[in-house]
Structure formats: C-alpha cells, structure tokens
Amino acid sequence: MNHSETLFEQAQKYIPGGVNSPVRAFRGVGGTPVFFKHAEGAYLYDEDDRRYIDFIGSWGPMILGHSDPRIKAALHAQVDLGVGYGAPTAIETEMAKKVCELVPSIELVRMVNSGTEATMSAIRLARGYTGRDKIVKFEGCYHGHVDSLLVKAGSGALTLGVPNSPGIPASLAEHTLTLTYNDIDEVRETFRQMGDQIAAIIVEPVAGNMNCIPPVPGFLEALREVCDEHGTVLIFDEVMTGFRVSLGGAQGFYGVKPDLTALGKVIGGGLPVGAFGGKREIMEHISPLGPVYQAGTLSGNPLAMTAGLTTLNAISEPGFHDRLTEKTNRVKDGFKAAADEAGIPLAVQSAGAMFGFFFTAEPSITRFDQVMACDVERFKAFFQGMLKEGVYLAPSAFEAGFTTAALSDEDIEFTLAAARKVMKTL
C-alpha cells in the first residue's frame, strides 16, 4: 500500500468521501486519488516523492505555475504585516483598480471569497436590480454549488451523475430555466415567450465544466441582443475563463460585453478569492449603496489581495498570453496527432490557455448531449495510463485542462511522448 492509499483510507474516517471537493475522489476515473505534498513550477510531487507534470493547476488558478517566487515573496512580506484586519486596506483598492483596467465591462467590483460566492451574489443582484425572479442557465454549465444554479449542472455534479442535487426546494428550482448551450434559436424562443419575466442569463462564455466547449459564432452576440431587447441582465461566469482565455477574459477574446461578470481562480493567485463586478448602474444596487445585501468576513483580506494582485501584474506582461496559448495548442494538437497515429477517434478543442479532448468520432463538440455520448471508459483508461507515465490530467472526462507559464518545451515533449505510448494501448 502506497502513502496515498494509506492517507485516503485515513481521510475517509473523518471527511465525507475522504475529500473536500467531490471530483478529487477519482470516482470519475477509478482508483485511489493521489495525495500531494509539494509543488513547484509545472510539477506536483506526491507523498511517495513521485513527480507529475500538472495540467490541472489547482483547477485553474496556478497560471504562473506552482510556488512562483514573486507570489511567495509578496505573501511573506504581507504575513509580516498581518494576515487580516476585517477593515479596509489600500491593497483592496489597488486590486479593484487592476480588475477594472483589465476587464472591459467592469466599472465597479466587489471582492468575495470564491467563485460560488461571486455567481450567487451576481444572481441576487440581477434579481434585485430587475425585480424579476427567473434565471436562464445552460445545460452542463456549472456556476458553483448555489441552490438555484445546481440544476442540470456540469463539473463534479456531472462527473458523479447527479446534476440535480437533492436538498434544493422545487419552489426555488422552478425559477431556473435550463436551455441548450450554443442553441441560439432556443434562446430566442424562450425570450419570445417569457422574456419580461427573466432577470438574468448566466453563462460560461467558454463552457469548461463539461470539458472545453467554446461558443459557436454568434452565440454570445445573440445572448447580448436578447438581454438588451428584454431588459435582462447578462452575466458572464468567468471564474474559469477570466484572465486565462485572454488578459481581458473571454469577453475580451470574443468582443462581447456582459452586464455583470463573476471571477475566481486566477484572480486569487492560488488563494481563495472571487469577485463580481460590472456596470456602475447595476453595482450601485449593492449595499452599502443600495438595498441588495452582500457581505463577507474575509472578503478582500490582504493575503488574498496580495497574491491576486501579484498574479495579475505578472500576467499583464506583453506576450504572456500569446506564449501560453501557443503551449496549449501544442499540447492539444499533440494529443490529436497521437490519437490519429493510434487510430483512436479524438476531438480536441481549446480557448486560450484551456483545452479539452473527447473520445468521439465527431469532429467538434458544441452541445451537452454530444459530451454525454463520448467514450468515458476510454477516457478512464487514458487518464490512468497518463498518470502512470507521470502526467496529471483532470480526473474526469467532463473537466477542462489548463496550461501554466512554467510548462517547458521539455515538459510538453514528455507529455506528448506519454500520450503516444498510452494511445497505442487503448
């Protein structure tokens, strides 16, 4: 029994399922989850001192790589000053200013502690601003474990086969309308029938919780159009895409501005941070300026702001995202070439520095039903094979992969050599 197996056995005695987030339990791929004790650059090291090239990056935040010296130095300096005050700090304003400068649609921003808090608060704000109750979301998109949004969700809910969680009152869920991602006609018809009742559309501009599905041409533009026509708030959930697809997020990449944006992951530099922001007219409805209540004990804490601001400054360097996207494309295209060489049907997709691959004969994946028809068993075998070779991919066929600035040419070549080897065994 290796150290991970022993630790997992112990963890299950005190933690539900042995993990603090379901996808980590390896239910989607089988076997025992790997327990890590150290990370540096592009690498993770498990409790048996085995090294893995990391394509998860803590599920997205570690865009610079692990243990970046700039982040470490900044955090050490802040720890000496104090880890939290529960009062305003100068760095909160610096962080907010930076976010407003980088994200095209954000005029005011409120810091929170997670992506779930960000989407939850954005939904409450949209309802308070419009005086309406109904929300439109899309099948397979995940917006955190918020009651009203955990309906036909992606991410860990999809991995475990429970996209509709028990514990959500029917009276609450009935206000959530779930449509088909990338189906423009369905959106238009829904708004034709009940547009004056809909407070908001919330959407992942690149769906990253049913693997990686970019928007089809015209989809985001159509959402913007129907929201403008019906006085509905358009919310982009950029928890995953923010600062990763491009410096300005998916909205900067695709040129479509939402009314509100939810942020997380990269914005915290590895610490727990979320944010939501948008048009001044809407954001001024948040307390203490307006009647929509939102608060948090640790919101804007100086440690998280320090890590986040240091990260945003680093990724603002010229050429950063171009280099990261080039690395992502090499990995994505290399996986496809390895599959073709082995005679394995595989579709690959990406947006900036996030990517996905699907074991399917279809040339591209644009909808949830296509995702569900992919060969999950073959994915499991590929995941386990790559893990044995020292490459750590997301332990679910329904999660996107991420590249980091620390990933070297040698790391990419090692990964693709492993992919060629494993593909031949499938």
Swiss-Prot record:
InterPro entries: 4pyrrol_synth_GluAld_NH2Trfase (IPR004639), Aminotrans_3 (IPR005814), Aminotrans_3_PPA_site (IPR049704), PyrdxlP-dep_Trfase (IPR015424), PyrdxlP-dep_Trfase_major (IPR015421), PyrdxlP-dep_Trfase_small (IPR015422). Keywords: Cytoplasm, Isomerase, Porphyrin biosynthesis, Pyridoxal phosphate. GO terms for biological process: protoporphyrinogen IX biosynthetic process. Its cofactor is pyridoxal 5'-phosphate. It is found in: Cytoplasm. Pathway: Porphyrin-containing compound metabolism; protoporphyrin-IX biosynthesis; 5-aminolevulinate from L-glutamyl-tRNA(Glu): step 2/2. Pfam families: Aminotran_3. GO terms for cellular component: cytoplasm. It is an enzyme of class 5 (isomerase). One of its GO terms (molecular function) is glutamate-1-semialdehyde 2,1-aminomutase activity. Belongs to the class-III pyridoxal-phosphate-dependent aminotransferase family. HemL subfamily. HAMAP family: HemL_aminotrans_3. NCBIfam families: hemL (TIGR00713), PRK00062.1 (NF000818). Homodimer. This is Glutamate-1-semialdehyde 2,1-aminomutase. It comes from Marinobacter nauticus (strain ATCC 700491 / DSM 11845 / VT8). The gene is hemL.
